[in-house]
Amino acid sequence: MTNPIIAFQNVSKVFEDSGTQVLKDINFELEEGKFYTLLGASGSGKSTILNIIAGLLDATSGDVLLDGKRINDIPINKRDVHTVFQSYALFPHMNVFDNVAFALKLKKVPKKEIEERVKEALKMVQLDGYQKRSIQKLSGGQRQRVAIARAIINQPRVVLLDEPLSALDLKLRTEMQYELRELQKRLGITFVFVTHDQEEALAMSDWIFVMNDGEIVQSGTPVDIYDEPINHFVATFIGESNILPGVMIEDYLVEFNGKRFESVDGGMRPNEPVEVVIRPEDLQITLPEEGKLQVRVETQLFRGVHYEIIAYDNLGNEWMIHSTRKAIEGEIIGLDFTPEDIHIMRLNETEEEFDARIEEYVEMEEPEDGLIHAIEEERHEENS
């Protein structure tokens, strides 16, 4: 990566009053013009990172760089960043125009330029014509758009968003995910988004940092994080997972549930204890005699797009299956899966060790040929 817009170098944070360490030796670099997400549960340290970038908190140790320059001692108003808070922090006694124009008025920008820039900012967030509207008469989604317009009107290098969608209902939250992502692409500004919602992170991000207990546990693209979780925490935090104890017999051969299965993982010691992950959507229901495993259906819930089926094998392991086919409680079904559906996690493997192992065993990445190519390939296989 060349010329990162934001960099953390060995940044730690300890709250002096309690002695609690909330960040532990954080290192990362953010590229300009990307959408980054800090994903983690409450207390993981994600908002602390955001507040240190903004200048609302000081790092206890380490360096924070903006465009290559150390900004640890730079005051908030001198940093080329803007924060959108969860509460939006709008002025209720001001109308939409005055809220969005507030920073420009402080800078004594000419009146005509303020009017033009406010109009353009509101147009970008689909609030054109709302200049005179009272903040108190806006919906939650509209207030959020005003907060974003106020953030982008100064044309900052970085926009920080601290769980801005959490107060919205599900439908509006989904709509705003699309709008935020498209806005970021149009502006080309670096967005740093904080959330505890893994679906938001997967849907919106170019790059995700998964956090736990003040540390970055894993970072990568949404596809990488979902398909190749580095440990038990990530596998359970990102989506649903079936996780079972296993033994890596040798490269590409794993044993679990008393049987041996082909896999696509390697680089581990012979007979090394591992954890095996299979996602619920990767399990296909078959006749019992045709399945690689047999399970008894315990219960199921209809989730709209699929049935969520809970079943147990003869060793007592719980299995979650996502299927468009309805099961019958108490029946025995078969489960089928491919070697590509099996993901192997080493015990206590670091992200650096994981990356080195993957790089050694993956000679080249498959090209992203797109959906149309995938459909054509499937049809070719069906016809051959």
Curated annotation (Swiss-Prot):
> What PROSITE patterns does the entry give?
ABC_TRANSPORTER_1 (PS00211), ABC_TRANSPORTER_2 (PS50893), POTA (PS51305)
Q: Hey, what's the signal peptide range on this chain?
A: none
What are the cysteine partners in each disulfide bond? Answer: none
Primary site of residence: membrane
Q: How does it sit in the membrane?
A: Peripheral membrane protein
- Keyword Iron listed? The answer is no
Q: Which GO terms describe its molecular function?
A: ABC-type polyamine transporter activity; ATP binding; ATP hydrolysis activity
Q: Identify the keywords attached in UniProt to this record, alphabetized.
A: ATP-binding, Cell membrane, Membrane, Nucleotide-binding, Translocase, Transport
Domain ABC transporter, which positions?
Answer: 6-238
Tell me the enzyme class. translocase
> What positions belong to coiled-coil segments?
none
Q: Cellular component per GO?
A: ATP-binding cassette (ABC) transporter complex
- Residues noted as binding ATP in the record, renumbered to the chain: G40, A41, S42, G43, S44, G45, K46, S47
Query: Where is this chain's protein located in or outside the cell?
Result: Cell membrane
| Keyword RNA-binding annotated | no
Task: Quote the catalytic activity from the record.
Answer: ATP + H2O + polyamine-[polyamine-binding protein]Side 1 = ADP + phosphate + polyamineSide 2 + [polyamine-binding protein]Side 1
Function of the molecule: Part of the ABC transporter complex PotABCD involved in spermidine/putrescine import. Responsible for energy coupling to the transport system.
**Hey, which family's this protein in?**
Belongs to the ABC transporter superfamily. Spermidine/putrescine importer (TC 3.A.1.11.1) family.
The annotated subunit structure for this chain is: The complex is composed of two ATP-binding proteins (PotA), two transmembrane proteins (PotB and PotC) and a solute-binding protein (PotD).
Protein name according to UniProt: Spermidine/putrescine import ATP-binding protein PotA
Provide the species name.
Streptococcus thermophilus (strain CNRZ 1066)
